Amino acid sequence: MLKSTKLKNTLLVGATAILVSCGGQKEIKMGSYAYDAQFLKDHGIEYTELVSADGNSKVMVIPAWQGRVMTTSASGDEGDSYGWINYRFINEGKVSSQFNPVGGEERFWLGPEG
């Protein structure tokens, strides 16, 4: 009888822990505007957002990077991120005096920089 009660209590605690852990924050989908915004925020990169009145159209600009437009969205935070962000380069935290391929939207290079 004692083993049965102990097993029931263990199962109850385990089930409760699973339910509580599943009820946390909603996962942000990679490739979304919100994912890119969170990634840059987590790396201490400050940006400015231009947002339409309905909140769907968004433009993310990083003033410290010559006002570079990093990404845009036509469907708010959950919408697709139309820019390209070089996650690996930003994660490494390296800065070059010549060229920093951090990404962005609508950038086109014709020759070497520097």
Where are each of the predicted segments found?
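Surface-exposed acidic/polar loop and edge beta-strand patches at domain peripheries
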Residues: G23-G114
